[in-house]
Amino acid sequence: MAIIMAESSYERRIKALYEKQIRMEALEGKFIKKVFKFNSVLLDIKETSARHQRKVGKMQKVVTERREELGRRVTFMGHLTQEVEAIKLRNLAMKDQIKQQKMLNNQRKNEIMERIHTLSKTTGTYVNQEALPARVKGVTVIPGDRRNQLIPFDLNATDDEGLNSLCQHLESLNVDVSQWQQLVSLAMDVALGARAPTTPPKEAANCKSIIEIDLTSPTS
């Protein structure tokens, strides 16, 4: 009877050990599953993090490129502003120069017209401005005791012989030929000035008032 009880106790211990081993294996299996699941989740997290890092890297690259582009645009706009201001200053200087030149021209023209009026009165000569510069046309009045003598003339401006002959004739009538010639010369200058093309000076023609630049493509 004692031997049977001893075997039962041994069997119980073996059975207990076996059951414990079963439980340990079951726990080990669960732990392995949890570890596998954890590793799987960790791998997913790493892959997600890697994708996120790649996106962040791309975004940082884009931000850097945009920042560099913005810097180029700011520099470009700075140069452009300086150029526009320089052009404005040149334009103002050119306008002032043209204004001064016009004032001088008008002053000179007034002086010439006044001189022409004086010479015309002194020599008694009227010169037809409309015929100039192609022809020298007009009339000289020679005062007389009873009546004035009219000396009309209508010559080609290049007819030197005819003009010399006319001057000799006027000189014989006591007309101051030097003043008469000066009158014709000044009238010729006025006629040539009136018929000259009113083109702006070369500097004004080259002056820039409007700049068309593609602001979407700044220079590097």
From Swiss-Prot:
Tagged with keyword Amino-acid biosynthesis: no
Principal cellular location given in the protein's record: nucleus
Cellular component, GO annotation: Ndc80 complex; nucleus
Keywords assigned by UniProt, alphabetized: Cell cycle, Cell division, Centromere, Chromosome, Coiled coil, Kinetochore, Meiosis, Mitosis, Nucleus
Stretches assigned to coiled coil: 79-114
Record's signal peptide: none
Localization in the cell: Nucleus; Chromosome, Centromere, Kinetochore
Record has Cell cycle as a keyword: yes
GO-annotated biological processes: cell division; meiotic metaphase chromosome alignment; meiotic spindle organization; mitotic metaphase chromosome alignment
Function according to Swiss-Prot or TrEMBL: Acts as a component of the essential kinetochore-associated Ndc80 complex, which is required for chromosome segregation and spindle checkpoint activity during meiosis and mitosis. Required for kinetochore integrity and the organization of stable microtubule binding sites in the outer plate of the kinetochore. Participates in SAC signaling that responds specifically to disruptions in spindle microtubule dynamics. The NDC80 complex synergistically enhances the affinity of the SKA1 complex for microtubules and may allow the NDC80 complex to track depolymerizing microtubules.
Family per similarity comment: Belongs to the SPC25 family.
Subunit comment: Component of the Ndc80 complex, which is composed of Ndc80, Nuf2 and Spc25.
The protein's name in its UniProt record: Kinetochore protein Spc25
Gene that produces this protein: Spc25
